Amino acid sequence: MKKALLTAIICTFAALQSCSSGKRSFATAMKGTETTNSTTGYTAAIREIADKGEFWNTLFTLVSNGSSKENVCISPLSAQLALSMTAAGATGETQEQMYNAMQLTGDINKSSKEIISSIAAPNEQCEVKIANSIWVNEKLDVKENFINTNKEYFGAVVENVPFNKATLSRINGWCSDKTNGKIKSILDEIKKDQRMFLLNALYFKGAWRKEFNEGNTQEKPFTCKDGTKVNVPMMNQSLRTSYYEDNAMQIASMPFKGGYQMLLILPSEETGDAELSKHLAGNFRNSLAQMTTCEVDLSMPRFKSEFSTSLKEPLKTMGAERAFGDNAQFDGISDTPLFIDNVIQKTYISVDEKGAEAAAVTAISMALTSMPRPVEKKVMNLNRPFLYIITDYAAEKILFIGKVGNPNEK
């Protein structure tokens, strides 16, 4: 079997409608298409995805194509918030490119504040936490308006500190604290030219509305991208839930308590990586709107995955080039010439019989320039690469997106 996507997206969408549907079966095996491990330049497929898709799908496609890992997970929302904090101090073409890459318009600061407030609202049944911080080298003179904007709209904690080993430890400790210990560190060192770090941390923990019975979990084969089979703990249950299928994919909703859901996406046998990305770009939200209530026999693996990546090249490919060069315009931050020298993101996700837990930290480093209706029965056996999406029904922002090609890969 060729390379196929397993996408992890913790996201936010409008409520999905439920209704009955006509009976059709969808039990074909899924084969993908080998993708190129490169993010340099816009391929025709990437350009098409970007033209008709959304930030999360374009970013994930670039990261996934550039990774040799079978399991990939990123947080578009964490990246977007960290980048928006930084863009608040950008001017001219630099700011324009950053917002265009994220496909953002309007009052970005106000929108970011609303997103943070809606996602982090108190929820007794589901835990979602967002935290932002800015760590400034005490030698850098930062403009007051930039600091005030990030405090007011992003709730950012601002620290003026010496850039030494003690501060490195504090930054990594902040990451661990804000992700309940799931992301223990984000930085290995502080380089001599670095003057500022802008961090976002995102944490999610939700319990299934209907848990899997652990007694029904069995060791079963999972077919990896190269056709090899590995035995994994496969969870099983039958549930009445929202469901959609077309010639390219199946989608089923696995609801959490507290208003979130995980969308599980299983590509068809004929749908490869590039085709799936383009299909999602053009049809994803319309597919969600067409989901109907079915009785789904669901099998999916229990798994845990950690992933780390640089988003620098994908973001440059998406058009935000000037922010990463010596001609970057961040004079809204400081009169000292600065540019983004890297965007690092680490993620964690765990899925088991009781629910799911996920975390992400994005670090941007700035350096000196140089009543149930009758329902239809469906079968969905996730014993090969598939996609999963966790959504909150109120907002419309992607929190996490990832890929698992082998549940045994840590």
Regions found by a protein language model. Give the residues of each.
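Conserved short hydrophobic interaction patches
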Residues: 101, 279-283, 314-321
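Internal alpha/beta scaffold segment
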Residues: 267-292
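Non-catalytic, conformational "gating/processing" segments within enzyme and secreted inhibitor domains
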Residues: 69, 111-268, 289-372
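Detector for small/aliphatic-rich hydrophobic stretches
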Residues: 2-163, 393, 404
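C-terminal soluble interaction/assembly domains
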Residues: 342-410
